[in-house]
């Protein structure tokens, strides 16, 4: 039986891993074994942080809505409660943009919310 040389496949595999690790510091970009570990860890961080990014944006939107709602005499929780009672279905992302860029429209929304809360 003939001997199988896997040099071409091994070289391609190493090259692929080292290409992904380009820009890493020290041995993480030079040594195959360490580069492979670094890429696996980077993938774990990327997976985790894609989920954290969504949470962080939601927190940011809530902070912005709360700040502008308090400027108009409401807390965030009462604002959201009043919006559901008034039947206003604007998500937090859009509401935070309105709070930043269109304060007049946000004030009108707050007035509608206050009317819904007083009834």
UniProtKB/Swiss-Prot annotation:
Name one process (GO BP) from the record: ribosomal large subunit assembly
Q: Which Pfam families match?
A: Ribosomal_L20
Which Gene Ontology cellular-component terms appear in the entry? Answer: ribonucleoprotein complex; ribosome
* Alphabetical UniProt keywords: Ribonucleoprotein, Ribosomal protein, RNA-binding, rRNA-binding
Origin, by domain of life? Bacteria
Gene3D superfamilies attached to this UniProt entry: 6.10.160.10, Ribosomal protein L20 (1.10.1900.20)
Which GO terms fall under molecular function for this chain's record? rRNA binding; structural constituent of ribosome
Family stated for the protein in its record: Belongs to the bacterial ribosomal protein bL20 family.
Q: What does this protein do?
A: Binds directly to 23S ribosomal RNA and is necessary for the in vitro assembly process of the 50S ribosomal subunit. It is not involved in the protein synthesizing functions of that subunit.
PANTHER family xref list: 39S RIBOSOMAL PROTEIN L20
Its recorded name reads: Large ribosomal subunit protein bL20
